[in-house]
C-alpha cells in the first residue's frame, strides 16, 4: 500500500536490505566470474596531458599565479605547525618519529596537490617541481605496505605500536608494515576516508606518469588499485560502506584506460553494484538504496557529484543503458532545480533529507553539506563547497564525453569561471571553503567556515582540489572524436595533436575572452594539409555567432550546441569566431523563493556581484536593479589582476535602519546612483567585505 502510494506521487519505494542483498551478492559472483564485454559509448576523448598550453590572456595569467606561487605556497603549508601533512608521510616512511596530526583525509589532499604539481610540470618542466615531487614520492613509496595499502594514520599507529612492543619484548603484532599483517584493519571506519585517499593516490600516480614518464608513483598507484581489487573480492560488503567522496571510482576507471587491464573496469562495476549492500545506508552518502534506483540528486554534494562522475566513467567504458537513464535524470534534477547560477552545488550546511521521510518518521535522516529540496537555493547560508563544484565539473565533463552535447561544456565553463575560481584568491595563496551568493555582516549568527579567505583551513580538502582542477583547466579546452576537434573553452593557448593519427598540427587561439567576444583560431603548424572538422561551442548564454575562414564567411552546421566547420587545413589558415556578448539581467524560476523578485547580472560566462569596497556609503541591502539598466564594461585591477567590471545606474533605497523591526511599511524614498559590479570570482580579495549576487529588481 505504501509503495503504491509512493509510486503514485513519483517517490522511490525504499526496499529493505534483505530484499536486495541476496540478488546483489549473486550478481557480484557472476560479475567476478565473467564480466560482459565492454561496449564503450564514448563520443569524445580527452586530449593528452601537456598537449594544450596557455600562452597568455585570462587563463595564462591564472596559470602563472598557480605555477609560480600557489604550488610552492601550499608545499610550505604542508610543512607548517597547522598543516603537518608532509610530516605524516615522513613519520610513516620511518624518516622521523612522532604521531599523526590532522584529519584522516590529509593523505588524499596531499595527493591532490601532487597531481597539481605534475600537471604544471607537464607544461613547464620546472626542475624544482620535479625535485619536490621526487622528495614526496620517495616517502609515499617507503610508507606503502607490500600489499598496496597506505593510510598514514594507520601506518604511523602501527609503527609506534611495533616499536613499543619491541621495547617491551613482545613483538607479536605487526599490522600495516611492509612485511604483511596478522589482522587486516583496513576500512574499519568509513570516516577514515581510506578509499578517498587511495583514489587520489591512484589518480596522482597516473598523471605523474603521463607528465614525467616516470613510474615511481605509478607503481605505487597500481599496488593501491590492486589492493582495492583484492579486498573487494574477499569482503565486498565491508568495502561497500567505505565509499565516502568516492574518488576511487574515477581513479580505477582511469587506471583501466592507462593499463588496458579489464580487472579495473570489473572493479569499477563492482563498486557501483555493492553500494546496494550497505546496511543502514544513508541518503547523505547516496547508499540507502542501490544506485540504479536513484533518479534525483541527494545528500552530501561532494559525495554525490563524485559518485555521478564515477558512474559516468562506467557508462563511458561499458555502455550500460540503465546507468545513462539514472545519470540523465539526476543531471536534469541538478541543473533545472538544484544548481546555483554560478554552477555551485550543495545548498545546505546541515538539515534533514527530503528523501525517504514519508510515512515513517523514524526514517528521517540528517544530511550535511548537501543538496536540499528542489528549488531550495538560499543565498547567505548556501554551503556550495568548492569540492562539490569541482565534482559538478567532473560529472559534466564525462557527460560531454558520452554525448558530445555542448550543454555539458556550458556547465564546465560556468564552474571554472565562477564557483571554482572563486575558491582561490587572486594572489594564489588564500582560499574559500564555501561559496555563498551573499555575505552580510548583519546576520545574527555565525556560519561554520570563515567569512574571509584564509591560507589554511582545518578541513583542507578544497584548496588542493582547487589547485589541481585549475592547473588542469587547459585539458578541458579541447576534446577529440574520430573525425573532429571540439573547441570547448576559449582562451590564449596552443594545442598540438595529430588529427589524422599521423601528421602533427598545432592550433593557436588568440583572444581576450572572457572579456572580449572574438576568438581567432589559427593553424600555426602543419606538415601537410589535413581534412578534419573543427567544432566550435556556441555558449548557452549566446544568441548570435559569426564565423569566417581566412576572412570569408563560410557555411556551417549546428549540432548539439556546436558549429561544425569543415576544411582541409593548412598552415596559416585562420578561423574567426565571434559570439554575441551582451550584459544579461537574469531572473530565477519563481519557485526559488530566496530569489523571487530579484535579479543577477551576467556578461559572457562571468557572473557579477556587488561588493562593499565598491559601494562607498551604499549598503548592499539598499540596492535595486532596474531591469532595463544598461551596464558599461570598464577595465579595473584588483590585487594585480586585470578584469572587466560593469558600471550602471541602480536604485538606492532609503537608508533607514530597521532598528530591530521584522516588518514595516514600504518606504518610497530612493535615488538613482551609479555603482560598480565585479566578477563574482574576484570578491573577497580586498579584505573582509559584504557581497551579493542577487538584488531586488525594479520593473
Model-derived regions, located:
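C-terminal beta-rich recognition modules with glycine/proline-rich loops and embedded aromatic residues
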Residues: 327, 409-418, 423-525, 558, ...
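Solvent-exposed beta-strand/loop surfaces of large extracellular or lumenal domains
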Residues: 542-566, 585-591
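Catalytic-core region of carbohydrate-active enzymes that cleave or remodel glycosidic bonds
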Residues: 316-337, 377-429
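Solvent-exposed loop and edge beta-strand segments that line ligand/cofactor-binding
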Residues: 41-44, 93-110, 126, 163-165, ...
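Low-complexity, Ser/Thr/Pro/Gly-enriched N-terminal "stalk/linker" regions
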Residues: 39-109, 134-174
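Well-ordered alpha-helical scaffold segments within catalytic/enzyme domains
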Residues: 51, 57-61, 65, 112-127, ...
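Bacterial N-terminal signal peptides
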Residues: 21-34
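Aromatic-lined, polymer-binding surfaces characteristic
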Residues: 146-147, 193-210, 217-257, 300-301, ...
